């Protein structure tokens, strides 16, 4: 995603995960708090232990810095979604994981930036959905799908 970006646990740099996961949101918060002077409820917390839940809680009560963190995260993920839509034309993209609990705080910026970065021909055609599956169910269904795929081969 980002050339010379953040180091990822996989050993590469700039992976989408480092910006748009729960850990990525917490990392963005720590970066913003280090380089900026904006007032924020997040400043009341230990910078080394800030979580995405802390950012969500602050954003939920209108904290401008926390809202900007979700906007920035949504912009990065929205741009990536636009790229994905351009080469694959899916009917929908289904989001999954703990960060989706942020709801519209995350999904609205994703939707806005995806649409903004799409060619006109693709705009308004791809649904962005949040999975209702439990994490344990998703793992089982994913493993099952691999079995179905192998059987078809």
Describe these PLM feature segments:
Residues 3-7, 12-153:
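ATP-binding/phosphotransfer module of carbohydrate and carboxylate kinases, centering on a glycine-rich
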């Amino acid at each position: 995603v980002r050339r010379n970006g953040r180091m990822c646990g996989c050993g590469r740099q700039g992976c989408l995960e480092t910006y748009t996961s729960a850990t990525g949101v917490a990392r963005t918060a720590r970066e913003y708090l280090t380089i900026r002077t904006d007032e924020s409820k997040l400043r009341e917390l230990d910078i080394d232990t800030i979580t995405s839940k802390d950012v969500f809680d602050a954003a939920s009560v209108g904290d401008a810095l926390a809202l900007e963190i979700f906007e920035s995260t949504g912009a990065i993920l929205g741009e990536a979604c636009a790229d994905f839509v351009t080469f694959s034309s899916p009917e929908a993209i289904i989001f999954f994981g703990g960060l989706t609990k942020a709801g519209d705080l995350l999904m609205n910026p994703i939707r806005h930036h995806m649409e903004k970065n799409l060619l006109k021909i693709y705009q308004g055609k791809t649904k962005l959905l949040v999975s209702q599956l439990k994490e344990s169910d998703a793992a089982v269904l994913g493993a099952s799908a691999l079995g179905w795929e192998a059987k078809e081969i």
